[in-house]
């Protein structure tokens, strides 16, 4: 799970504090949580981030997963509200703010073009293909999101040369 904080301090202590208050909530759903670790990520990013490793337990089922938490990413045009229906809790639906599909695609396209043949993320190719072929999106917002993402990540020169980058990927024997 990726999480972007807006208007909040990003530190190991603040993350531990906020997550503890969330994980300690009794939702009467039978799920218990254990925070395993918090470690820094995105060392090359101006804003950095943290990876939180957790275990969720439901009866005898234990599911390990991680949350990557960062701040400073550009969300274009703005975060959207999504309503999700709980499968476990009788309390029903819950709302979250999430990236727009255009921002998700922009980040994946930027990663594909920036990393090129050095990419170790085949899921980005799959995700872009699936999103382009199954989800409605606004081309103008995608263009804006890609421009802002590349500017934020200081990769605009690479993005401007996208056709050469795609040719290298296409001709690669390892991709």
Predicted regions span which residues?
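Compositionally biased terminal segments of proteins
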Residues: 1-175
